[in-house]
Design a protein with these regions (language model features):
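Interdomain "pre-motor" coupling segment immediately N-terminal to P-loop NTPase/helicase cores
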Residues: 4-53
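Conserved AAA+ ATPase "SRH/arginine-finger" region at the nucleotide-binding site
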Residues: 203-216, 223-237
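AAA+/P-loop NTPase substrate/partner-engagement loops
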Residues: 111-147, 155-159
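Pre-Walker A adenine-sensing motif
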Residues: 70-84
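C-terminal alpha-helical "lid" subdomain
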Residues: 3, 229-290
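Dynamic helix-loop-helix/coil hinge segments at AAA+ ATPase domain boundaries and subdomain interfaces
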Residues: 10, 50-74
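Walker A/P-loop nucleotide-binding motif
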Residues: 85-107
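Conserved catalytic/switch belt of AAA+ P-loop NTPases
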Residues: 113-114, 142, 158-205
Length: 290
């Protein structure tokens, strides 16, 4: 029998270092002891257990968001109530891509804070950090300000159990959701999970009905549902004209519309995102900064 070769001290030290690093990644971070008193926009950094300030939020003025007036009015009313310390609902903005879901959240936050002394704080939570939400709630619970958590493009795939952490935000578990925290999410899916994932849960669960109900009901835990749908040609052109007027693009109306339609045909779709991309191209061509 061959004797096992002895590891060198250097190799053992390297192995221990890798093990320690792996344990550090698995262990929850120590929470920051204090919340920022200034600033109104942050990103949650779970590996630091703290918030990182965003100096400039890329947002546009509310009047430039066309074809979503009903959604705009509903969301701004809900957000104002929350900012004023009144009851408000968590909101799920779902539907067509590029129709202004995330733009609306940021624009509403900006509008609600206009002229306010105590700003509503917007905190972006990345999709991959959903599992750390209970840590964030623990940090915010003692805060004196009001916090709007925002997750863009939220959905869950097969074998993903982080949706259970989201319930801590929507319902709060045994402690209850802090009164100073609200959660907004955008998603292309109304029920946040693909149908095949729910079908698989039904087939393998001891109690199939309860397994699927748990996942479908995740969307039901949002008190406010706002649907976004593909825009018509008239809506698309209204977006183009509003952008062109706002940024002072000097071009004949007939040419603007014709070129905007050609651009949309080349992209194979009409949406707020496509309209903005056309305006960027046109502004560059005209030598205009926006």
């Amino acid at each position: 029998m061959k004797k096992r070769a002895k590891s060198s001290p250097k190799a053992e030290a390297s192995l221990l270092s890798r093990v320690a690093a792996a344990l550090d990644r698995l262990a929850p971070p120590a929470l920051s002891q204090t919340l920022p008193e200034k600033g109104d926009a942050f990103v949650w950094e779970p590996h630091l257990g703290a918030l990182t300030e965003v100096a400039h939020v890329a947002s546009i003025e509310l009047p430039l968001l066309k074809a979503i007036e009903n959604q705009r009015d509903t969301l701004i009313a809900n957000t104002r109530r929350f900012a004023d310390g009144l009851p408000a609902n968590n909101a799920l903005l779902w539907g067509a891509r590029g129709m202004g879901k995330s733009s609306l959240v940021k624009a509403v936050h900006r509008e609600v804070n206009r002229g306010k002394k105590s700003a509503l704080v917007l905190i972006e939570v990345h999709r991959e950090d959903i599992a750390s939400l209970p840590l964030l709630l623990r940090l915010l619970r003692g805060g004196k300000r009001r916090y709007l958590l925002f997750c863009d493009d939220l959905s869950f795939d097969k074998d993903d159990t982080s949706y259970k952490s989201l319930k801590a935000v929507l319902e709060g578990g045994i402690e209850g959701r802090p009164d100073n925290v609200l959660f907004y999410a955008t998603s292309n899916r109304r029920h946040l999970m693909p149908r095949d994932m729910m079908d698989n849960e039904r087939a393998t669960a001891i109690n199939p009905g309860e397994a699927v109900e748990e996942k479908v009901s995740l969307s039901d835990r949002f008190g406010l549902w706002l649907g976004f749908h593909n825009c018509s040609q008239d809506d698309y052109l209204a977006m183009i004209e509003a952008y062109a007027a706002n940024y002072g693009l000097k071009i004949a109306p007939e040419e603007l519309r014709a070129r905007a339609l050609t651009w949309a045909m080349g992209r194979g779709s009409r949406s707020g995102r496509v309209a903005w991309q056309f305006i960027q191209d046109m502004a560059g061509e005209l030598g205009k900064k926006i």
